[in-house]
């Protein structure tokens, strides 16, 4: 009995050659619509789908393969006599191979001219139905959704006249992943359209971007996936101009770096980061000077660090960066001369280019944090803060220079691991206390780092001070200005201590924990 294949594809790459090889192997081919036209034009003889179903394609192509003559031919178990008898009684011929890929829903909704009606019309119904029927019956039916599998299938058919069970099972698994991801995209689109903020089912889909050597540590397996609907301002979308493949830790650090610099839009700024904590932030009227400040902030920790700049890297800045061992440099662009300088004898230096004009769109992305057996979902810590809404809670008002420095410090503290303390002036970070289990410990570490640069310095805390001992430590170091959220039941103790020492202190009313 001649074996039959059903071919209906949106992505026609390689399909003509595949079909010709099938014909050479003695197969009959059933086809539909544009696929049939393409195969017929290439001289591949095909059977029209309506010759199999006895019904014409109708309703603008919405109904063409949803028929017992198709799905009976796919689902009939070859080892069940009752199935085979039912097929015979109803003149249903068996189908042994299905090659289907789906309407381009993802590509359609990414179009700038997308309309709701167009999106709906590009939801495939018949394709997923055939794929799922064939995949369910993979004991007997081979199903192909990816042109990359054409060669494997043809090779096995040529060698043995059939594919192996292992191949059919693998391809079936691929189909179910594919249709699940396809439906997840549709669900995400409709969820967005109706404005459902907290759906009872969370369906998200990601595509494999990079198979990694290992994860956070060598004993951990890891891979990097990119959102199926990619965003431009993302490490997953960055253009790599030089260097080795990004590691797991590189990606996490780089992601933290590009989040930090989003808050420094107004002036040229450089952020240096290690282990997801900023170790140096500098801003100035030009990017070279901003680099100088960021480097000066911590010339020790910068070794092996991640650097992100929010302006084009020029030759002068590149010359200063080149002698230092850095893991990654990220910027919106590089001058031709700067790129030549940075890549000279630096084949491993990872240089990334990222479109900073797409930052705003990245801020609305949800954050996902895995826990054992669960997933936490939250919006990003992105809030429009206006310094005019802040409250000076002490007797002394900040000077103009202190106010500028406090605003800079408040932007910087947002990305320091809690309990987080940062000391800055108006253009660079000076000391950092991160990740301590008590706040006064972070205060002491930050002061120790900044001890030679405390004249005119200010201090920011990511959360309230639970006790006045923090204020006593800060005052003893000579720091005169503090910014913090407030909100402690002992706020008045801290205010009284600040007034006692002549400090100025601002409450922002916004906490910035980062775990």
From Swiss-Prot:
The keyword Ligase does not apply. Pathway: Purine metabolism; IMP biosynthesis via de novo pathway; 5-formamido-1-(5-phospho-D-ribosyl)imidazole-4-carboxamide from 5-amino-1-(5-phospho-D-ribosyl)imidazole-4-carboxamide (10-formyl THF route): step 1/1; Purine metabolism; IMP biosynthesis via de novo pathway; IMP from 5-formamido-1-(5-phospho-D-ribosyl)imidazole-4-carboxamide: step 1/1. It comes from the Bacteria. Residues 1-145 form the MGS-like domain. InterPro entries: AICAR_Tfase_dup_dom_sf (IPR024051), Cytidine_deaminase-like (IPR016193), MGS-like_dom (IPR011607), MGS-like_dom_sf (IPR036914), PurH-like (IPR002695). It catalyses: (6R)-10-formyltetrahydrofolate + 5-amino-1-(5-phospho-beta-D-ribosyl)imidazole-4-carboxamide = 5-formamido-1-(5-phospho-D-ribosyl)imidazole-4-carboxamide + (6S)-5,6,7,8-tetrahydrofolate; IMP + H2O = 5-formamido-1-(5-phospho-D-ribosyl)imidazole-4-carboxamide. Keywords: Hydrolase, Multifunctional enzyme, Purine biosynthesis, Transferase. Its EC number is 2.1.2.3, 3.5.4.10. One of its GO terms (biological process) is 'de novo' IMP biosynthetic process. Belongs to the PurH family. The IMP cyclohydrolase activity resides in the N-terminal region. This is Bifunctional purine biosynthesis protein PurH. The gene is purH.
């Amino acid at each position: 009995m001649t074996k039959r294949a059903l071919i209906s594809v949106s992505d026609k790459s390689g399909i003509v050659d595949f079909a010709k090889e099938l014909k050479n192997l003695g197969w009959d081919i059933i086809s539909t619509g544009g696929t049939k036209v393409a195969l017929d034009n290439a001289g591949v003889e095909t059977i029209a789908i309506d010759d199999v179903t006895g019904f014409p394609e109708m309703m603008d192509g919405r109904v063409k393969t949803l028929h017992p003559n198709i799905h009976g031919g796919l689902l009939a178990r070859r080892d069940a006599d009752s199935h085979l008898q039912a097929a015979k009684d109803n003149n249903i011929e068996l189908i042994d191979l299905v090659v289907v890929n789906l309407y381009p829903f993802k590509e359609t909704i990414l179009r700038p001219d997308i309309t709701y009606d167009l999106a709906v019309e590009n939801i495939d119904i018949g394709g997923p139905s055939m794929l799922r029927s064939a995949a369910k019956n993979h004991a007997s039916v081979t199903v192909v959704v990816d042109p990359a599998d054409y060669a494997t299938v043809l090779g096995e058919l040529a060698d043995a006249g059939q594919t192996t069970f292992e191949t059919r099972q693998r391809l079936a698994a691929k189909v179910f992943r594919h249709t699940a991801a396809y439906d997840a995209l549709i669900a995400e689109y409709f969820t967005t359209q109706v404005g459902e903020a907290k759906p009872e089912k969370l369906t998200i889909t990601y595509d494999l971007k990079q198979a990694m050597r290992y994860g956070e540590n060598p004993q951990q397996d890891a891979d990097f996936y990119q959102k199926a609907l990619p965003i431009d301002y993302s490490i997953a979308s960055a253009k790599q101009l030089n260097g080795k493949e990004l590691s797991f830790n590189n990606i996490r650090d780089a992601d933290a770096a590009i989040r930090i610099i989003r808050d420094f839009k107004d002036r040229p700024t450089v952020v240096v980061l290690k282990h997801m904590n900023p170790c140096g932030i500098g801003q100035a009227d030009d990017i070279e000077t901003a680099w100088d400040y960021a480097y000066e902030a911590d010339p020790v920790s910068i070794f092996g660090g991640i650097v992100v700049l929010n302006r084009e890297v020029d030759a002068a800045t590149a010359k200063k960066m080149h002698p230092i061992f850095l893991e990654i440099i990220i910027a919106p662009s590089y001058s031709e001369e700067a790129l030549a300088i940075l890549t000279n004898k630096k084949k491993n230096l990872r240089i990334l280019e990222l479109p900073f004009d797409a930052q705003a769109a990245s801020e609305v992305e949800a954050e996902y944090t895995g826990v054992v057996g669960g997933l936490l979902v939250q919006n990003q810590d992105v809030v429009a803060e206006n310094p005019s809404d802040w409250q000076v809670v002490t007797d002394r008002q900040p000077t103009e220079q202190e106010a500028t420095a406090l605003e800079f410090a408040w932007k910087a503290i947002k990305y320091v691991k809690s309990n987080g303390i940062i000391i800055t002036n108006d253009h660079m970070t000076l000391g950092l206390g991160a990740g301590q289990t008590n706040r006064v410990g972070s205060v002491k570490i930050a002061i120790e780092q900044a001890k030679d640069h405390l004249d005119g310095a200010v201090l920011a805390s990511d959360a309230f001070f639970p006790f006045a001992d923090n204020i006593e430590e800060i005052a003893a170091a000579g720091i005169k200005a503090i910014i913090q959220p407030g909100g402690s039941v002992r706020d008045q103790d801290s205010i009284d201590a600040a007034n006692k020492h002549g400090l100025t202190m601002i409450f922002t009313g916004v906490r910035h924990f980062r775990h």
